[in-house]
Amino acid sequence: MFSFLKKKKKTPIFEIDSPKISLTPNTVDFISILEKFEINYTCVTNGYITFSAHVFDYAHPLMLGIHYNPLKIEFIEIFRPMEYYQQDAYDINVSFSELSEILIKKYGKPLITTSASINGYPCEQWRTTDYIVNHYIMDRFGPEEHLHINFYKS
C-alpha cells in the first residue's frame, strides 16, 4: 500500500575487533580494505583469502578465511594460526574448549550443543540477529576444528 511504510531490512554485520573492520555479506571490496589497513593477506585460491585478525574480544590473533564470489561473501571461517597446530602440546579438545568459552562470553550459551554429532566430536551453534556461528570438530585427514560464520540469506 504505502511503500514508505515498509521497514528497511538491516544489513547483517560481522565485526572484526582489530583491525576495526565491519564485514557484510555484500562487502566485495575487502581486499582494498585490507590493503588500506596494511594487512598482509594471502589469496589461497580464486574466491578465498586469509589474514590474521582479532575477533570475539580474544587476546590472541586468529586467522580469518573469507570465501567469496564477485557479488558477496559466502562465509567466513576462523581458525588458529598454523604455528598453534605445530606445538607439541596441541590438543584439539583443549582448543575446542578454549574457543567455546570465548564464544560463550561473546554470545552466551549456544542454541545447539551436541557432544557427539560428527564422528563422535562436539558441535555448537549460536544464532545472532546477523549470522549463525557453527563451531565443531570433524575428521577429514585427522580431527580438525572448524568455526564458520554464515550470514542469513537476504
Regions inferred by a protein language model and the residue ranges of each:
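Low-complexity, intrinsically disordered Gly/Pro/Thr-rich segments
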Residues: 128-139
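Short helix/turn-capping signatures at newly exposed starts of structured segments
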Residues: 1-122, 138-154
